Amino acid sequence: MPHTSKASGRRTVPFLAAAALVAAGACLVSPASAQARPTTAATAATGSAATAAAGSAAPKLWSTQLQFDDNGTPWSVAQFQAIAAKGMNSVEINMPWGQIEPSRGSFDFTELDTELANAAAAGIRIVPIFWQSGWGGSPAAWITGTEVTSTGGAGISPPWWDLAEQQDYFDYVTTTVAHITRNPGYGGAILNYGTLDSQWNDNGDGGWATADIDYFHQHWLPQTYRTVARFNSANGTAYTSFDQVPAAAPGQPLAGVYQDFRQWSVQDTYGRLTAAVRKVSSGPLYYYFGGHLANAPAMGNLPDVFFTLARKYDVTVIVDAAQSPGLALTFGSLANAYHVKLAQEWTAPDDPQMPAQAVQWISNYGMGLPSGGGEDFFIHDGTSKDVIGYPIYTAALPMLQGLKGSYPQQPVAVYVDFSQAWGNPDGGSLNSAENEITALWSSYQSGFTVVTSDEVDNHTVDLKKFRAVLPLNGADANVTAYQKSGGTVLTDGSQLTQYAPSYVDLTSAHALQVVPTTANDHRSAQLVLAEINPTFAYDGAVVVHPAGLDLVPGRYHAVDAATGQALPQVPEADGGSCVPLSTGTATLAEWRIVPGPAPAGTPVPASCSTAAGGATTVSAAAGDGNNGSNGVIFQNVGATGGGSDGNLTVTSIGGQTAYQTWTSAQSGVSPANAYLQLDPGSAVARAGTVNLTVTYWSVAGQGFTAQYDSTTDPYQNGPTVTGSGTGSWQTATVTLTDAQFGEAQNIQSDLRLAVTDPTQPLYLQSVQLSTAAQ
């Protein structure tokens, strides 16, 4: 079996070289405030002409992910041909470091070379995923170090700042890429340092291994602050050496300093890794972004870090979990601001939710245009994802590949403060930011732009170019400066459409979503319509507004892209049209909005409106099948995943079928909740004041608080119900005011019953919600 060896002598980063690397990046940290900042204008530059040109001509990634091989056998030409026949041009394969490099410095490329040859013969390119850890076979067995969490627990990855093992990974990647970069079956490489695609996510928050703390003391602190006196001045301390500065865990004094170091570590390491790969290959490169916006403080997955490096080294960013509109919108805005290609991938849910989530993920692709870099299906592995999700994805590929133009971004910003992730304790919370972006967009179907504090700080974006700014998680210094310079700062999402008009009106926003692509000449548009609710169908109309689509003024009509025929429609005064639409769950459609009135003979419905309607009372009860037939579903019934705060089990107590919440001992998390979703087409879902009636098993010491999506808080505290006695079925009715049910809570919920004592179960028999007029 042939082997390829590294050149003699391991290139471990010595002390001085490592210190120089920190010095080179020290301007990324602000020693004056103990709050690391993202890249400055200088460090955000696109680098040399050679670097900027690398990979620029790479085609879009239309791909599915595969295991490294087919149960020990190389993927065959026939298997790759079957993938190509579905409209894909690439496959991502999960690389097992230990198989490729079974011992330090000794490589076995036999199977990889065979697969590359087979792929090339089928017209497919292979994109290796270079996991450092977290996937089978990575890290290699001869890598022995282990990361440590902030609580002292064992992590998954090697210690981030074990320089010898870090260099081992760098050498594994660069040696492999150098070997395959000119192979016709090679389609680029995905770089992933840390745990999978979520950096510091090591059974919690990694970064407290001895090697990490040593690097913090010996390199980062001296290069950032230069002297202990400057550190003391910035942080109000009285240390006599850097070794005395604690590697503070979250919640402890000086935690922000260590958080700065962790975030800088991601930026520095990915930068050096990418530069090393660019020295051996000009082929396509990719970064995976795993997790969600709320994970940035713990995981270190700051979006702007990856986009800054992607701009410098011509890397495509792949956003995982792109089924989230809030995440896809944010990354689409960033991709367009940084001029970086954006590919999208989903994280598949449980089978019942999979069809609706698949069409949601697919329809979100247009949010990244004109910077769209393709799609990847996770994962073609013979499981239910292949049976349910894969056919939906492959059937939609021709539609996605035919989208031409741009998402119609308006000069209105939804602003997200990310400074908390850099260690600023006063920064805005990111916990609900992504869901709130989703709720804003779903409610108003408006082409606002998402802007991050990092974009403004590194001068990629200037807030002055926006007609209005809506701060999502607090007004920081950037927003204050914008307002002082005459900018308009909004205080509520309902004000968005005054500055960024809706491109469509919907009957029920959280059952249907519409993602537009406007042609470059602004005289036509493509609309991808997705029925995204796994339970509740859409029944109503869609009103199209040319101004929101950024079309030139005039008359337009809607055409079914599949048939080329004009849809039944009623002309609107603004030049758009109202199109009746009734569609089942988890369906996709494409419309074209074209200039001119509808052709003669096009049916004109007698009426067409998105006006409110629907049920004024909705309910659900344990034992009714939880199918939403009465307008409410309990979320996560039968779920068994650890770490979830909303799992429910079907049980029986007091002679009644009931839902039982998991205790904190079962779930491993301290809160316990019962999450509820309302039929978005009901009058209840649109009501501002709602009466909630709950039948529950009453015992002393147990109860619940109704927390609901409101105009100001997705988890607004409503009334608390307190149990009594030793156990009996009781019914309580409370009133929820200022409601705005936008599915902004976890798992797209509208409200939850927060358990008073999560160490004990709460039993629920039924819920009913009625408009206040009832």
What residue ranges belong to the model's regions?
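Carbohydrate-binding surface patches
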Residues: 409-446, 452-453, 460-480, 504-552, ...
